[in-house]
């Protein structure tokens, strides 16, 4: 009896490597919401896959699947089992492996989104893992958040300040937050958003396209 024949693994047909976009930020800031909106806003033009990080569950993967952000096979949940920061920075091997596995499944992916687990303002992505980093904070944390600094706020490629609609409810002054953000980030860009209302999502997409050279 002849041995079964299997199709050779698919090979990438596109010239440029996939763009890896890391999305970080504190718990509840809106990382998963941003990822959902980016997938829905870009999936018609680009081949997308997404990787989510949680400590003990795959809850964010489940939420994105239920929301219909992408087909289920294109969303991979990673259980880090420890500090979320470690899994994206000091020892990113679990996420690097996840990226590799997704690219075996979808070799022509244009963008790999990697959402970190909720962490503090010191969280950053390893350059081995992410080409672009987006850091999400929210107005509900108070107008003081931008001036607290930390690598996520000062060094990320794009800072997203989410939940601007809550400013009157928490006594936050958006002009003060914007001014403090410019002081902390210098020329680095930021976007004020209300992601649930899709306010600011187009600006984030434009940033990814321009900075990631997707429009060339």
From Swiss-Prot:
One GO CC term, this protein: cytoplasm
Location of the protein in the cell: Cytoplasm
Keyword set, alphabetical order: Chaperone, Cytoplasm, GTP-binding, Nickel insertion, Nucleotide-binding
UniProt xrefs under Gene3D superfamilies: P-loop containing nucleotide triphosphate hydrolases
CDD domains assigned: UreG
Annotated function: Facilitates the functional incorporation of the urease nickel metallocenter. This process requires GTP hydrolysis, probably effectuated by UreG.
Name the record gives this protein: Urease accessory protein UreG
Organism ancestry: Bacteria, Pseudomonadati, Pseudomonadota, Betaproteobacteria, Burkholderiales
């Amino acid at each position: 009896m002849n041995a079964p024949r299997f199709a050779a693994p698919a090979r990438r047909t596109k010239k440029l490597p996939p763009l890896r976009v890391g999305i970080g930020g504190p718990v509840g800031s809106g990382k998963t919401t941003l990822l959902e909106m980016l997938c829905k806003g870009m999936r018609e033009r680009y081949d997308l896959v997404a990787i989510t990080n949680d400590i003990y569950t795959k809850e964010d993967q489940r939420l994105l699947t239920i929301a219909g952000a992408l087909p289920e096979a294109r969303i991979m949940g990673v259980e880090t089992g420890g500090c979320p920061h470690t899994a994206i920075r000091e020892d990113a091997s679990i996420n690097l492996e996840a990226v590799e596995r997704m690219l075996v499944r979808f070799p022509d992916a244009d963008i790999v989104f990697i959402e970190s687990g909720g962490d503090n303002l010191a969280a950053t992505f390893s350059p081995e893992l992410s080409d672009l980093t987006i850091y999400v904070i929210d107005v509900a944390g108070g107008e003081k958040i931008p001036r607290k600094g930390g690598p996520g706020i000062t060094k990320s490629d794009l800072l997203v300040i989410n939940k601007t609609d809550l400013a009157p409810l928490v006594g936050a002054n958006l002009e003060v937050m914007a001014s403090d953000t410019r002081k902390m980030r210098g020329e680095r860009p930021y976007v004020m958003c209300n992601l649930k209302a899709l306010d600011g999502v187009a600006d984030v997409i434009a940033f990814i396209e321009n900075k990631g050279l997707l429009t060339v």
